[in-house]
Amino acid sequence: MAETEEEEDSEAWLRLKPVEPLPSQCCGSGCSPCVFDLYYRDLERWETARARNDRSLLSGKQPPESQSCSAKLSPETFLAFHISTMEKVTKDTYLVRFTLPGNSRLGLRPGQHLILRGVVDGLEIQRAYTPISPVTAEGYFDVLIKCYRTGLMSQYVESWRTGDTAFWRGPFGSFLYEPKKYGELLMLAAGTGLAPMVPILQSITDDEDDETFVTLVGCFKTFEGIYLKTFFQEQARFWNVQTFFVLSQEVSPEQLPWSYRDKTHFGRLGQELVAELVACCRRKPFTLVCGSPAFNEDMARCLLSAGLTEDSYFLF
């Protein structure tokens, strides 16, 4: 009889043992804590509780689904947020607005990002996204999400409908913009790599005391693929902001509106153009880079060749 009770107790403990995450559950963005950090923390807690035969030591663990959006944003726990609107801004990209309770703020600083959790065919996946809404936005936050034909997270996002719930945790990010710290910022972004630049840029132009010069360069395939055109047109009206675009699949300025012809380069952003951008800055710029791993690597190499040092740029 005692042996049966011992076996049942052992099985009960095994059911409580944390499950090691799959590789797909790691977003690959170097977040801290990572899903694997959380797993090892919970595993250590479980091992201690089992050794002491004290299940109360597991009380710190809460399933992500148990937290509603009324709770405080946490890097460790996923919170539920409702989708209020979902706008298709290009053929493969959505601007999604999530509701915050009352007039509360999300609590991110410019440059920080969140982790989205999705489940497709029973497989859990996680990806990093940067909200593009102002950090002062009340009652909502906006996220720009590009969908890929074979992407698992893309399948999950394209299944969303207004009123659905999505789970986020955060904030994360080792770059935190500090007003007036840099005399000049050079922003190099490819595609949705614009996302972390948007709240940083807006925080500068919203602050009358922050006179940081900003040169933003957005890289896209076509003019139609440029995100947030209206926003960047408005930002370019500020005395301390310049915006440029690099289009890899356009060949003639005649196909562009007049307002874009003088600030658009055709081809790819390479060594020569990066050197020219750095040289045109009023002072040595601090450079922010965000795009694919290959884009980031190329830009780092170009910046070093242009005379910048490794401590004068940041790769998102």
Swiss-Prot record:
FAD binds at residues 158-173, 183-215. Residues 17-53 form the Oxidoreductase-like domain. Residues 76-178 form the FAD-binding FR-type domain. Its EC number is 1.6.2.2. Transmembrane segments: none annotated. It is an enzyme of class 1 (oxidoreductase). Its cofactor is FAD. Keywords: FAD, Flavoprotein, NAD, Oxidoreductase. It catalyses: 2 Fe(III)-[cytochrome b5] + NADH = 2 Fe(II)-[cytochrome b5] + NAD(+) + H(+). PANTHER family: NADH-CYTOCHROME B5 REDUCTASE, NADH-CYTOCHROME B5 REDUCTASE-LIKE. Belongs to the flavoprotein pyridine nucleotide cytochrome reductase family. This is NADH-cytochrome b5 reductase-like. It comes from Mus musculus. The lineage of its organism: Eukaryota, Metazoa, Chordata, Craniata, Vertebrata.
